């Protein structure tokens, strides 16, 4: 059994309250006082108190902006080239912070055999993976995999690849790092999908160290043992969550039907995930549900007949950080490990995240 031996997270410097973000968005999404009031009500009911960004502009005055133009209408609006330049500058420090905390007192950087980098908010070649190798002086012969444009479920997919590697290559030490700078892709498009996306998404990074079971035992690493993965695509939701390139950045489509699609599919996903394991809902101690939004957590809680305490970590991450896309489920797993897990007990954790497709990706973990 492969083991997630360590999880660490990192946040950018600028913390914005949800009301401050709502004020900023209202300036560009609402052309009347009535629309501004409606938008602020949406923000107040989002379940989010604060979000982090690599950009200070969302709670600063017009003259203090550093990313957007100091104009009343943000023109000339940032191009995709400018946004990618900003990503390349700001993403690496977050990755390094998360990685250094993750591997500290676990392994030396020179011992890492595989690097899996994850992002859907920045792309370039040579890319983030090579920047990490260079900065940390990793072995130039390290095996590298980049997982791009999968969205919020990509961390679980990356853990799946790490698990495959550990099972196939004795001695493998796999580092997974996810970083998303969602806030550099703010768009002024005045439609509900875009308004909801701007209300939810934030910036952050997370790293996970995955090793084969024998290495974990030899080094007395405690962590999450990986039991199983299961993925399911709800093709009737293919157009309800999309992420596409444009001349002014990445465009998010996030329809209001997503909670309904998840509500209809989550029971079957859970049932199929448990096949061959003889596990029931009552056997799961901890629930690492990706907090894609308050409504998503509510429908999952209802459909799986969970108590509010079962999703405590998911709600806490949503409240304090918002939806950071791929790193978010790792934030939830870290919160569970730090605050809820009793490491000496054989507790089970069920994790699930959602993304374009509509894809639902799940993972079953056991304390080791």
Give the ranges of each region predicted by the language model.
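Condensing-enzyme catalytic core mediating Claisen C-C bond formation in acyl metabolism
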Residues: 1-86, 173, 186-264, 268, ...
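Glycine/charged-rich beta-loop-alpha catalytic/anionic-binding loops adjacent to active sites
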Residues: 78, 110-114, 136-148, 188-193, ...
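Short, well-ordered amphipathic alpha-helical segments that serve as non-catalytic structural scaffolds
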Residues: 48, 90-104, 161, 205, ...
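Acidic-glycine-rich active-site phosphate/pyrophosphate-binding loop
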Residues: 123-138, 176-187, 238-243, 297-311
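Claisen-condensing/thiolase-fold acyl-transfer catalytic domains that form or cleave C-C bonds
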Residues: 120-121, 139-141, 146-167, 263, ...
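Active-site glycine-rich loop that binds ribose-phosphate moieties when present
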Residues: 140-142, 147, 157-161, 178-198, ...
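Phosphate/pyrophosphate-binding loops at sites that engage ATP/ADP/AMP, CoA/4′-phosphopantetheine
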Residues: 98-112, 218, 267-285, 304, ...
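Conserved beta-ketoacyl condensing-enzyme motif
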Residues: 42, 46-138, 281-297
């Amino acid at each position: 059994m492969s083991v997630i031996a360590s999880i660490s997270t990192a946040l950018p410097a600028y913390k914005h309250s949800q009301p401050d973000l709502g004020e900023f968005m209202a300036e560009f999404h609402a052309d009347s006082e009535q629309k501004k009031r409606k938008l602020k009500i949406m923000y107040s009911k989002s379940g989010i108190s604060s979000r982090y960004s690599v950009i200070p502009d969302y709670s600063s005055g017009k003259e203090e902006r550093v990313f957007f133009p100091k104009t009343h209408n943000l023109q000339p609006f940032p191009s995709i080239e400018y946004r990618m330049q900003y990503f390349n500058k700001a993403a690496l420090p977050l990755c390094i912070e998360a990685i250094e905390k993750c591997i500290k007192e676990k392994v030396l950087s020179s011992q890492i055999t595989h690097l899996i980098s994850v992002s859907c908010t920045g792309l370039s070649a040579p890319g983030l993976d090579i920047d990490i190798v260079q900065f940390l002086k990793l072995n130039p012969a390290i095996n590298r995999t980049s997982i791009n444009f999968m969205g919020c479920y990509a961390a679980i997919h990356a853990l799946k690849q790490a698990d495959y590697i550990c099972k196939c290559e004795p001695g493998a030490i796999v580092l997974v790092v996810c970083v998303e700078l969602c806030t550099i892709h703010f768009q002024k498009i005045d439609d509900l999908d875009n308004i909801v996306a701007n209300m939810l998404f934030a910036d952050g990074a997370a790293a996970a160290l995955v090793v084969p079971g024998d290495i974990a035992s030899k080094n007395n690493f405690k962590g999450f043992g990986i039991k199983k993965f299961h993925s399911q695509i709800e093709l009737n939701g293919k157009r309800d969550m999309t992420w596409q390139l444009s001349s002014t950045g990445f465009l998010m489509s996030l329809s209001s039907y997503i909670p309904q699609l998840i509500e209809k599919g989550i029971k079957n996903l859970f049932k199929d995930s448990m096949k061959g394991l003889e596990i029931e809902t009552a056997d799961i101690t901890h629930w690492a549900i990706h907090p894609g939004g308050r409504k998503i957590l509510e429908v999952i809680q209802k459909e799986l007949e969970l108590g509010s305490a079962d999703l405590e970590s998911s709600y806490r991450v949503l409240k304090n950080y918002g939806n950071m896309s791929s790193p978010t489920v790792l934030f939830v797993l870290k919160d569970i490990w730090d605050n809820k897990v009793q490491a000496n007990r054989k507790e089970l954790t069920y994790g699930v995240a959602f993304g374009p497709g509509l894809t639902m990706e799940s993972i079953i973990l056991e304390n080791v």
